[in-house]
Amino acid sequence: YWEKLAMDGIVLMELGEYPWSKKYGWVRDQFGVTWQIYLGEKQGDQKIVPTLMFIHENNGKAQKAMDLYTSIFPNSKISGILKYGEGVGNETHEIPENIQHAAFKLDGYTFFCMDNSYNHQFDFNEGISMVVMTDDQEETDHLWNSLIANGGRESMCGWLKDPFGFSWQIVPKKLL
């Protein structure tokens, strides 16, 4: 995977050994999507794990986001949290209470998230979104209203941004 993703992309962290993984690398592919490849504990059968990095004005909000997401989706829970103050590596510039790495499940699917204070040249935008297929109007309304509450905003055609600026598409199955 690494060679193909790195081709015509930008390596953000070389593929190699780090304190948290015997094999890890971070790359931005030719389309601007970043990928973290690592050898770690198997997360069930899910090979690709969406990872949200809370940066800029959202740095320090990963916990709030996980709390929101796990409260509105069924079969959801926070699986583990590692804060910078108790973590590995030399992240002395980070706020100790912020999340270095966390795992959570939404409707049975694994997600990771983290806070980071670096001045990254990217942020959440519509280029990446989560698509949620709903069974009925009640589920659609519940997810929509929960995700736009407290600072989220509606967009067009079933799109919205949650209070953290992350994009979601809420799509009733009967429309497909």
Report each predicted region and the residues it spans:
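Vicinal oxygen chelate
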Residues: Y1-Y24, S71-I72, G85-G87, L106-T110, ...
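N-terminal beta-strand motif that seeds the catalytic metal site of vicinal oxygen chelate
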Residues: I10, E14, Q36-E91, S129-M130, ...
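Short, structured interface segments
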Residues: Y24-K42
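A structural signal for well-ordered alpha-helical scaffolds and beta->alpha junctions
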Residues: A62-M66, E97, Q137-T140
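Acidic pyrophosphate-coordinating catalytic loop
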Residues: V88-E97, Q121
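Short, structured active-site "lid" loops
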Residues: I95-G108
